Amino acid sequence: MKITLPDNSSRELPEGSSGYDLAKDIGPGLAKSAVAVTIDGVQKDLHDEIMTDSSVSIITIDSDEGLEIMRHTLTAQVLARAIKNLYPKSKLAIGPTIEDGFYYDVESEEVISSDDLNKIEEEMKKIIKSKSSITKKLVSKSEAMKVFKSNKEPYKEIIINESDQDDSFQLYYQEDEKFVDLCRGPHLPNLGFIGSFKLTKVSGAYWKGDSNNSMLTRIYGTAFNSDKDLQQHLDNLEEALKRDHRKLGKEMDLFHFQDEAPGMVFWHPYGWNIYKTLQSFIRNKLDKNGYLEINTPQVVDRKLWEASGHWDKYRENMFITEIDEEHANEKRVNALKPMNCPCHVQVYNQGIRSYKDLPIRYAEFGSCHRYEASGTMHGLMRVRGFTQDDGHIFCTQDQIESETALFISLLSEIYSDLGFKEFDIKLSTRPEVRIGSDEVWDKAESALENAIKKLDYPYKVDEGDGAFYGPKLDFVLTDAIGREWQCGTFQADFNLPDRLDAEYVGEDGNKHHPVMIHRAILGSFERFIGILIENYAGKLPFWLAPQQVVIASIVSEVNDYAIEVQELLKDQDVRAEIDLRNEKISYKVRDHSSKKVPIILAIGKKEKIDQTVSVRRIGSNDTEVLDLKEAIKQIKKENSIQH
């Protein structure tokens, strides 16, 4: 049979050869590092037979795919077995990989806490030390059920029973065959390939994420090919904890959450300063780029959500209200809007539109609500109530490319001003199930791609990952400690204008549906503020800082001068506060430095007489004495985004 390799070269191998046979045929070095194989785009175990002509690539342990497989094997074959060894009555649920790691969910009569992680790690090391080979058996549904019924693993039985498969269930064993797990694979050929690992935390998780089901114990871990890479990751985790926006939010008195309004932010004055400043910044950019700001209702009748199609797809995530309307035969059912797009179409639909009116760019700081399960919420990063920097562009097919280019330029400018000089772009193309003709899709995909190319931005294509109603662009930021955040989106939509009867009169005198482009730059204010706080470790750029300047008196006799300085700074639109407390200046400096105040002006008798201020900047132990007018001039300059 003919095997085609990634470089388009080919080799002839006997039918039934494995990926390992191919690796050996290519060279002993490759065979030594091979851990799995990709056959016609599908990952398989290294020793799986290849039966027909195929395109094949070998996955090595030092590749990203190899690392993922190592983590998968570690959770499914090592962590799971260690848990069963230490807690024989425990029941195994699922053990997937996640970004930079893995977890396993188990039901245990004994409490498993973070204090037990070292013990579990030691048991895992014993298992790895065996360097046991891992073998796979393919069995029927009834055979798989029999195995896990015998092993008293009810969660595995549920998974098997709910599967659409009738055969080819994959059971993975180690050499002694004393442990078996159900898994899609692939796995490492043996445990000797496992590198460095660390169990990181224990938490609770509902089976299938449903609060009506059993609460399970979730054990998290991470793994890398070397001690160095593992330590770097653990150092990053430690740094991330220091930067946690929830911790800094409390220290800086920015916001809080409470049980009476789960997932809803209580913004404090300083946090609201950040929010307002960011909103004003975005509003100014949008205004300069031809956007028309609108505001639409938060509570909308279900009829609109049914017409848009969101009622069927989003109902479980909506907050729904019922109102007894006067003289009505039945209650009126409304929903808090989970997104703004159907409402924006209603604004567009007021009046007759001509092709000469297009493009129309609407923007809204839209307050939205979506129900998120309590276990998924995470500070500002995932909430139930949020504000989107939302926008919708109504344009013709011929205008998609120019609108794409304008949007990317605007997004780039905003990200740069906020401190993110680079970003990644992902283009998601047509899925198999879609609406619209191939001609329309060709035109839209080419428009997005051409705009990126003309602006000379690197990008990658995600084939088939677009929405059923149009291709899209995703924009991903990388923060100061290397974490990626998908924020911006640009999504073409051929569906909603049709469903909601959005039209324009074309040059031909006939009515046409416009293309509707959903776009956002920040995503949501709440999440983006969380990202900013963590990116800057609370030390936000001066123009965005919640408290920009604190004037701290050294003695009470200079309080009047401190107030005068504050007023002069406020006249220059600087967020300036005074600290006249009867405390030592060293205490005041420490206190305000801990709250990440960029500039502290210390004022004593000498400063008052000389009309100067002692300037202390965050992160520096040095103090600079400046003439008051010069200090205000410098601070005013720093308050400009482009200073």
Give the predicted meaning of each segment:
Residues M1-A93, I98-H643:
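NTP/phosphate- and nucleic-acid-binding module
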